[in-house]
């Protein structure tokens, strides 16, 4: 493990592996950089991969108060560690974060961007966005109800059946999810009301590949909307892949895009 110091002096931990052009992975939802370690290992045969813990996750610090701009600065520090520029891959909500970072001043450092199933919940997608999501998360946090925070995320943000999540709460790994529950408030900060801010997305000039798996209709709907809004976008569907995409399915897509 290595680390960099972000602009506000927060320590950001990362793993570096492989050789070749630099690729930065922006992940971490209710977990740490180990979530994307299998993908990093596959990409390492052709790229130097920087897989980092977002602030508040894993071995990285979490200086308060939180602001989305601090996460842009964290990514900026990782890009500097990667030599000043890199290809960037972001998955799900962190993919939205990477998209906003590209539009928020980091475009010169991001050679190309690839994002997997940005979880915007749009009108016409067949899903209803959760109401007062961040406020409810914050209230549950104040009451010490971390398990209910995670349940709220899975049921109302992800769209999983409540009955399934009730079963998941009995799993031995659920306690680890509860430990990461405070980071859901950070994610809610940049996801907002889950709508896609078309004007903001349209200003992202970085060449971007928007990928989905075709298995979750509302996420495919969002992927199409993002790609149609970006000025320099390509689309790709990895047929048959759920939201928890297999590294073996994703790696060749990223290799092709980042090598072209």
Pin down the residues of each PLM region.
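Conserved HGGG/HGGXW glycine-rich cap/lid loop of the alpha/beta-hydrolase fold
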Residues: 3-61
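Active-site loop/oxyanion-hole signature of alpha/beta-hydrolase fold enzymes
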Residues: 41, 50-89, 93
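Conserved hydrolase catalytic core segment
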Residues: 85-125
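Helix-rich cap/lid subdomain of alpha/beta-hydrolase
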Residues: 118, 122-172, 187-188
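Hydrophobic, aromatic-rich cap/lid helix
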Residues: 172-196
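Short beta-strand/loop motif that positions the catalytic acidic residue
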Residues: 204, 210-212
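Conserved alpha/beta-hydrolase "acid-adjacent" motif
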Residues: 217-222
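Catalytic active-site module of serine/aspartate enzymes centered on a nucleophile-bearing elbow/loop
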Residues: 231-260
């Amino acid at each position: 493990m290595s680390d960099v110091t972000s602009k506000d002096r927060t320590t950001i931990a990362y793993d570096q592996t492989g050789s070749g052009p630099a690729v930065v992975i922006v992940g971490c939802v209710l977990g740490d950089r180990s979530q994307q370690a299998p993908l990093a290992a596959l990409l390492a045969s052709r790229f130097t991969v920087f897989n980092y813990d977002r602030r508040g996750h894993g071995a990285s610090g979490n200086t308060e108060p939180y602001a989305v701009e601090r996460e842009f600065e964290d990514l900026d520090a990782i890009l500097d560690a990667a030599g000043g520029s890199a290809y960037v891959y972001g998955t799900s909500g962190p993919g939205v974060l990477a998209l906003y970072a590209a539009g928020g001043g980091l475009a010169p450092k991001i050679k190309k961007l690839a994002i997997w199933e940005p979880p915007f919940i749009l009108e016409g997608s067949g899903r209803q966005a959760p109401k007062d999501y961040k406020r409810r998360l914050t209230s549950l946090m104040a009451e010490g109800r971390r398990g209910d925070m995670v349940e709220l995320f899975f049921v109302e943000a992800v769209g999983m059946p409540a009955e399934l999540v009730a079963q998941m709460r009995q799993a031995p790994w659920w306690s680890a999810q509860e430990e990461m529950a405070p980071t859901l408030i950070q994610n809610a900060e940049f996801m907002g009301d889950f709508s896609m801010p078309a004007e903001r997305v349209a200003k992202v000039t970085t060449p971007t590949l928007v990928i989905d798996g075709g298995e979750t209709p509302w996420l495919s709907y969002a992927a199409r909307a993002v790609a149609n809004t970006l000025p320099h976008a390509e689309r790709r569907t990895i047929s048959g892949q759920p939201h928890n995409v297999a590294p073996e399915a994703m790696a060749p897509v990223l290799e092709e895009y980042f090598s072209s």
